[in-house]
Amino acid sequence: MDSIFFGKLNIEVAAASGIEAVVKRELVRLGYEPSGANLGRIEFEGTFEDVLRANVFLRSANRVRIVLAKFKAETFDELFDGIFSMRWQDVLTRDARIIVDAKSVKSKLFALSAVQSVVKKAIISKLSTVYNGTFDESGAPYCIEAAIVDDVVTVTLDTSGEGLHKRGYRTYLGEAPIRETLAAAMIQLSVWNPERVLIDPFCGSGTIPVEASLIGLDIAPGMNRNFACEQFANAPKVREKVQDEAEQRIKRDRQLRISGFDINKDAIKLALKHAERAGVKDNIHFQVQDMRDLSSKYAHGVIITNPPYGERLMKEDELKALYRDFGRVTAKLDEWCVYAITSYRGFEKYFGRRADKVRKLYNSELECNFYQYLASPPPKRDGQTR
């Protein structure tokens, strides 16, 4: 029996709708040649070390999987046969704890519990013939996904475990938190770079300033957590090598100008805790401040924020007034770029300006718009990028 983890692998990166291109650019910067960037999935070829690198370094991706097989199945018999034909002995250890997940889109096989049952039965049947006996599934978990789209089954093995938004620094949640992966994507969709000023006037528990600091200092988001693939007994041990690479990339001496403000003092306390846990507390200025008091000594800068929205946080009349005030305050910062994400469809009307660009993004399952207001770039200083 040969383990697949010592050869070339087809690796799939899952991303939220709307940010596939961001993840693709991240993969290119890591040295890979990804193919496609749609339907929330991007693929590239690599080794098991590349699987772990993707988990450690990707900022905007949801998770990383290994593609095991693709085949057409319109009946449960075809599904069983396709799964049974695979060399599961090269993927799973004899004591593997097998977990099966399923998804179905525009396919004849749409009963997910039945799909899960058939897939698990086929895997067990195959391994029983190989090992000539039973097994207790007492080892490391191996999560298999059967995703059926247009009657084509893609079988993958999850390597991440918990979603990649779980960085390890955010243990306390404020009101209406934004996912770390989405915050990182918003920053990368903006014109901000480490040479520029960044302010989040509704910073809440600090996710956007923290993610910007991680980007600015080149700190890998997955440095301080573990991944499911590290438990695979039949895979090479490469964490130390990847961790060393991540350590060497860090630019601790880089000076950043990142600020987070919020009217809620408890939110600022959370933000400080999260920044400390992320190792970037000294790189962010947090302060209790009403958005209406926002000003800056800098003529040029970037505002990236997740303002309040939704009935749970405030009444609609209060929301409209808040957005009006936000528009008035930022209008005074006329050489600043403004990026705001909200699910409220009337944002542009009450903000007082039509956005230069609007992009549909999802905060967890909530559909939002990412409004982008651009400005002229700052004068370029010697050796400085804009």
Model-derived segments and their meaning:
Residues Q287-D293, K297-R386:
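C-terminal catalytic and target-recognition region of SAM-dependent MTase-like enzymes
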